[in-house]
Amino acid sequence: MNRVKRAIIMAAGYGNRMLPITHTIPKPLIKVNGISMIETIIQALLKNEIEEIYIVVGYLKEQFKMLTKKYPMVSLIENPYFESCNNISSLYVAREHLEEAMILDGDQIIYNKDILSPNFHCSGYNCVWTEDYTEEWLLSAEGNRIVSCSRSGGSKGWQLYSISRWTREDGRKLKEQLELEFEIRRNRQIYWDDVPMF
């Protein structure tokens, strides 16, 4: 059994799907039922005793500083590429923290701490089987391996949630692959998920 020791929360993007609200506030800081989305994540991580928390910031980054005061275990990592690159750049700037890590998007609402359980068998994503049509990413798997991913959605597949866990070894491999794609191949318009999946 593997155990997550740290979390990387991706929060550098513009949140275009929530315009005009995100003109003045980053999407992860939008409050739902009186609490920001990202704080539901932080609190669930803390309840799971995951206390090494990194938030990758970019757009309106100064607004995240209050989180480091409220939660001293939170560290901010600035993504200087967020305006010109896809989210591969956010994981690239956090690549030193990928071993035994959980990676998740900051614009999720976590009410059940068990969703962020630190215990896991092998590296991979949180998914749920769906028979119904979804526009979310849909994975096909054989055993413990992802064999394909439809970004346009579909039905009868594993709907991807943006929560993944990585062993020490797989975290090292992911770091190497991120460096290869971002530095050498200069693939800067891809999703970070493209690196381990494709």
Where do the model's predicted regions map?
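A short, N-terminal amphipathic alpha-helix
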Residues: 35-52, 93
